[in-house]
Amino acid sequence: ASAGSGMYVMTSYIPDQEVVLEKNPNYWGEATNVDKFIIKIQPDANTQMMTLSGGDIDVAMNMTDDTMSELEGAENISIINGATKTVGFVMMNMDEAYGGPVSNPQVQNAIRKALDYTGIQTICGSGTITPYDIIQVGFMGSKGERPADYTNLEEAKALLAEAGYPDGFDVDLTVTDLDMEGILLTDLAQKIKDDLSQVGINVNIVSQPWAAG
Protein backbone atom coordinates (compact mmCIF):
# COMPACT_ATOMS: atom_id res chain seq x y z
CA ALA A 1 0.00 0.00 0.00
CA SER A 2 1.10 3.57 -0.59
CA ALA A 3 2.42 5.68 2.26
CA GLY A 4 -0.44 7.51 3.96
CA SER A 5 -3.07 4.91 3.04
CA GLY A 6 -3.34 3.39 6.52
CA MET A 7 -6.26 3.71 8.90
CA TYR A 8 -4.53 6.42 10.96
CA VAL A 9 -2.61 9.60 10.17
CA MET A 10 -0.07 11.34 12.39
CA THR A 11 -1.50 14.71 13.37
CA SER A 12 1.07 15.72 15.98
CA TYR A 13 4.61 14.81 16.92
CA ILE A 14 6.62 16.29 19.76
CA PRO A 15 10.12 14.74 19.81
CA ASP A 16 10.82 12.72 22.96
CA GLN A 17 7.32 13.48 24.29
CA GLU A 18 4.38 12.18 22.30
CA VAL A 19 2.89 11.13 18.97
CA VAL A 20 -0.80 11.64 18.13
CA LEU A 21 -2.51 9.39 15.57
CA GLU A 22 -6.06 10.14 14.39
CA LYS A 23 -8.52 8.22 12.26
CA ASN A 24 -7.85 8.63 8.54
CA PRO A 25 -11.11 9.91 6.98
CA ASN A 26 -9.95 8.65 3.59
CA TYR A 27 -9.08 5.13 4.71
CA TRP A 28 -10.16 2.61 2.08
CA GLY A 29 -10.73 -0.35 4.40
CA GLU A 30 -13.12 -1.17 7.21
CA ALA A 31 -13.51 1.79 9.56
CA THR A 32 -11.87 1.63 12.97
CA ASN A 33 -13.86 2.38 16.12
CA VAL A 34 -11.01 4.26 17.82
CA ASP A 35 -10.77 7.91 16.79
CA LYS A 36 -7.42 8.81 18.30
CA PHE A 37 -4.30 7.31 19.86
CA ILE A 38 -1.97 9.40 22.02
CA ILE A 39 1.38 7.65 22.35
CA LYS A 40 3.46 9.00 25.23
CA ILE A 41 7.20 8.54 24.88
CA GLN A 42 8.39 7.44 28.31
CA PRO A 43 11.37 5.07 28.37
CA ASP A 44 11.50 4.76 32.17
CA ALA A 45 9.61 1.65 33.26
CA ASN A 46 8.96 2.96 36.78
CA THR A 47 7.36 6.13 35.43
CA GLN A 48 5.24 4.02 33.08
CA MET A 49 4.12 1.91 36.02
CA MET A 50 3.09 4.95 38.05
CA THR A 51 1.18 6.60 35.21
CA LEU A 52 -0.57 3.32 34.41
CA SER A 53 -1.49 2.76 38.06
CA GLY A 54 -2.77 6.32 38.28
CA GLY A 55 -5.00 5.91 35.25
CA ASP A 56 -3.14 8.49 33.17
CA ILE A 57 -2.40 5.95 30.42
CA ASP A 58 -4.25 2.85 29.23
CA VAL A 59 -1.38 0.69 27.97
CA ALA A 60 2.28 0.41 29.00
CA MET A 61 4.92 -1.47 27.07
CA ASN A 62 8.60 -2.29 27.61
CA MET A 63 7.96 -3.13 31.25
CA THR A 64 10.63 -4.83 33.34
CA ASP A 65 10.19 -7.94 35.49
CA ASP A 66 10.33 -5.77 38.61
CA THR A 67 7.62 -3.35 37.50
CA MET A 68 5.35 -6.15 36.30
CA SER A 69 5.68 -7.99 39.60
CA GLU A 70 4.55 -4.82 41.40
CA LEU A 71 1.50 -4.55 39.15
CA GLU A 72 0.41 -8.17 39.59
CA GLY A 73 -2.94 -8.28 41.35
CA ALA A 74 -3.51 -4.54 40.95
CA GLU A 75 -7.13 -3.60 40.40
CA ASN A 76 -8.17 -2.85 36.79
CA ILE A 77 -4.74 -3.79 35.39
CA SER A 78 -4.19 -6.79 33.13
CA ILE A 79 -0.72 -8.13 32.36
CA ILE A 80 -0.36 -9.77 28.95
CA ASN A 81 2.77 -11.80 28.24
CA GLY A 82 3.74 -13.17 24.86
CA ALA A 83 6.63 -14.26 22.68
CA THR A 84 8.23 -11.70 20.37
CA LYS A 85 10.54 -11.87 17.38
CA THR A 86 12.99 -9.44 18.96
CA VAL A 87 16.64 -10.55 18.83
CA GLY A 88 19.51 -8.57 20.33
CA PHE A 89 23.01 -9.13 19.02
CA VAL A 90 26.51 -7.66 18.84
CA MET A 91 27.78 -6.76 15.38
CA MET A 92 31.50 -7.20 14.69
CA ASN A 93 32.93 -5.43 11.64
CA MET A 94 34.50 -7.88 9.18
CA ASP A 95 36.59 -5.14 7.54
CA GLU A 96 39.99 -5.06 9.27
CA ALA A 97 40.37 -1.35 8.47
CA TYR A 98 37.39 -0.62 10.73
CA GLY A 99 36.98 -3.68 12.91
CA GLY A 100 40.63 -4.22 13.76
CA PRO A 101 41.07 -7.39 15.85
CA VAL A 102 37.34 -8.23 15.85
CA SER A 103 37.43 -8.75 12.08
CA ASN A 104 39.40 -11.95 12.77
CA PRO A 105 37.07 -15.02 12.87
CA GLN A 106 39.08 -16.57 15.71
CA VAL A 107 38.64 -13.42 17.77
CA GLN A 108 34.92 -13.48 17.04
CA ASN A 109 34.72 -17.05 18.27
CA ALA A 110 36.72 -16.08 21.36
CA ILE A 111 34.22 -13.33 22.12
CA ARG A 112 31.34 -15.77 21.74
CA LYS A 113 33.04 -18.16 24.16
CA ALA A 114 33.78 -15.40 26.68
CA LEU A 115 30.23 -14.11 27.09
CA ASP A 116 28.21 -15.19 30.12
CA TYR A 117 24.88 -15.97 28.44
CA THR A 118 23.16 -16.98 31.66
CA GLY A 119 24.04 -13.63 33.19
CA ILE A 120 22.85 -11.81 30.09
CA GLN A 121 19.52 -13.63 30.26
CA THR A 122 19.20 -12.59 33.90
CA ILE A 123 19.51 -8.93 32.85
CA CYS A 124 17.00 -9.44 30.03
CA GLY A 125 14.40 -10.97 32.34
CA SER A 126 12.30 -14.10 32.58
CA GLY A 127 11.35 -15.91 29.41
CA THR A 128 14.42 -14.86 27.43
CA ILE A 129 16.53 -17.40 25.58
CA THR A 130 19.87 -17.38 23.76
CA PRO A 131 19.58 -18.54 20.14
CA TYR A 132 22.61 -19.71 18.18
CA ASP A 133 22.25 -16.87 15.69
CA ILE A 134 19.97 -13.99 14.68
CA ILE A 135 17.15 -16.33 13.62
CA GLN A 136 14.90 -16.65 16.63
CA VAL A 137 14.00 -20.05 18.05
CA GLY A 138 10.73 -21.26 16.56
CA PHE A 139 11.35 -19.80 13.11
CA MET A 140 12.45 -21.65 9.99
CA GLY A 141 16.23 -21.77 9.79
CA SER A 142 16.83 -21.46 13.53
CA LYS A 143 19.64 -23.57 14.96
CA GLY A 144 17.92 -23.72 18.33
CA GLU A 145 19.14 -22.45 21.68
CA ARG A 146 22.79 -22.01 22.57
CA PRO A 147 23.65 -24.64 25.24
CA ALA A 148 24.03 -23.41 28.80
CA ASP A 149 27.64 -24.67 29.00
CA TYR A 150 28.76 -22.85 25.83
CA THR A 151 30.79 -20.25 27.75
CA ASN A 152 34.42 -21.33 28.20
CA LEU A 153 36.99 -18.72 29.22
CA GLU A 154 39.97 -21.01 28.69
CA GLU A 155 38.89 -21.76 25.13
CA ALA A 156 38.36 -18.04 24.57
CA LYS A 157 41.89 -17.25 25.77
CA ALA A 158 43.35 -20.00 23.58
CA LEU A 159 41.53 -18.64 20.52
CA LEU A 160 42.84 -15.14 21.22
CA ALA A 161 46.38 -16.49 21.50
CA GLU A 162 46.02 -18.36 18.20
CA ALA A 163 44.78 -15.17 16.58
CA GLY A 164 47.86 -13.29 17.79
CA TYR A 165 46.32 -11.51 20.79
CA PRO A 166 47.52 -13.47 23.86
CA ASP A 167 47.30 -10.32 25.99
CA GLY A 168 43.98 -9.17 24.58
CA PHE A 169 43.35 -5.77 23.00
CA ASP A 170 41.33 -2.57 23.30
CA VAL A 171 38.09 -2.14 21.36
CA ASP A 172 35.18 0.31 21.18
CA LEU A 173 31.61 -0.93 21.61
CA THR A 174 29.06 1.53 20.26
CA VAL A 175 25.62 1.23 21.86
CA THR A 176 22.47 3.32 21.71
CA ASP A 177 20.62 4.45 24.83
CA LEU A 178 17.51 2.58 23.67
CA ASP A 179 15.22 0.72 26.05
CA MET A 180 14.30 -2.44 24.13
CA GLU A 181 11.29 -4.21 25.65
CA GLY A 182 12.27 -3.16 29.14
CA ILE A 183 15.98 -3.83 28.63
CA LEU A 184 18.48 -0.97 28.60
CA LEU A 185 21.06 -1.73 25.94
CA THR A 186 23.63 0.25 27.93
CA ASP A 187 23.20 -2.28 30.77
CA LEU A 188 23.90 -5.11 28.34
CA ALA A 189 26.95 -3.26 27.03
CA GLN A 190 28.33 -3.01 30.57
CA LYS A 191 27.76 -6.75 31.06
CA ILE A 192 29.63 -7.49 27.81
CA LYS A 193 32.47 -5.21 28.92
CA ASP A 194 32.74 -7.06 32.24
CA ASP A 195 32.64 -10.48 30.57
CA LEU A 196 35.30 -9.70 27.96
CA SER A 197 37.62 -8.23 30.58
CA GLN A 198 37.97 -11.80 31.91
CA VAL A 199 39.93 -12.75 28.78
CA GLY A 200 41.95 -9.55 28.45
CA ILE A 201 39.71 -7.62 26.04
CA ASN A 202 39.32 -4.04 27.23
CA VAL A 203 35.99 -2.64 26.00
CA ASN A 204 35.40 1.10 25.77
CA ILE A 205 31.64 1.75 25.70
CA VAL A 206 30.65 4.53 23.31
CA SER A 207 27.05 5.53 24.01
CA GLN A 208 25.02 7.48 21.49
CA PRO A 209 21.43 8.77 21.55
CA TRP A 210 18.85 6.64 19.74
CA ALA A 211 17.84 9.75 17.76
CA ALA A 212 21.34 9.89 16.27
CA GLY A 213 20.66 6.65 14.40
Regions found by a protein language model. Give the residues of each.
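Short helices/loops that flank or line small-molecule/ion binding pockets
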Residues: N46-D56, G73-A74, Q106, D187-V199, ...
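Ligand-binding "clamshell"
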Residues: S69-N81
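Periplasmic-binding protein-like
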Residues: G99-F139, L184
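Ligand-site clamp/hinge motif
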Residues: N24-E70, N202
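Ligand/substrate-recognition segments at binding pockets and active sites
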Residues: P15, A161-G213
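A bilobed periplasmic-binding-protein/Venus flytrap-type ligand-binding module shared by bacterial periplasmic
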Residues: E22-P25, T84-A110, A114
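Gly/Pro-rich hinge or "lid" segments in bacterial periplasmic/extracellular proteins
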Residues: A1-A31, K36
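Structural transition elements
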Residues: Y8, I129-E162, L178-D187
